[in-house]
């Protein structure tokens, strides 16, 4: 019994931590490569916050507004968990819809995050949706990359900090550029976790050397 539980917990750690974070980073870097103006603006914020490639600190990372906007917009477009499932604990009625106790309720996050009723031109990558000016106007229940309430993702803060730290360290040293193998637009596999249908292929250029670097894979 203990061996089965150990395997189950290990599997949860891998899928809940490693796979989700790495896939989110792939989506973010893809969007930066296909939106060079956003990539440049983010690198300028990074260079201003950590001059001369200084090691990132927690206090500085949490103050980086544009980095937060880029991460949030990518998680809107590509929520790694395409849906949330919750078990109804008691009979309830919401807007005239009766939900009996014991019913599994599914929230389709990918559809919610790409609904033009809440997100004008949802297929467009616009970090400004999450600017200080616009953020307060977002209904908290239409943006749920980590769920919400007492059952939201327990690793949310850790995951966001890992993603931001990785992005800063990578973008301090490299820029990303589309190449002929880059799939535009990106096709998604949405059975289970949201992920690219094919590997994301981009050119990786050391900062300052321009687009002549050889392609690498993400």
UniProtKB/Swiss-Prot annotation:
Heme binds at residue 153. This is Cytochrome P450 3A19. It is a peripheral membrane protein. Belongs to the cytochrome P450 family. Its main location: endoplasmic reticulum. It comes from Capra hircus aegagrus. Induction: P450 can be induced to high levels in liver and other tissues by various foreign compounds, including drugs, pesticides, and carcinogens. One of its GO terms (biological process) is oxidative demethylation. Pfam families: p450. Its EC number is 1.14.14.1. The keyword Iron applies. It comes from the Eukaryota. The gene is CYP3A19. It is found in: Endoplasmic reticulum membrane; Microsome membrane. One of its GO terms (molecular function) is heme binding. One of its GO terms (cellular component) is endoplasmic reticulum membrane. Cytochromes P450 are a group of heme-thiolate monooxygenases. In liver microsomes, this enzyme is involved in an NADPH-dependent electron transport pathway. It oxidizes a variety of structurally unrelated compounds, including steroids, fatty acids, and xenobiotics. Its cofactor is heme. Keywords: Endoplasmic reticulum, Heme, Iron, Membrane, Metal-binding, Microsome, Monooxygenase, Oxidoreductase.
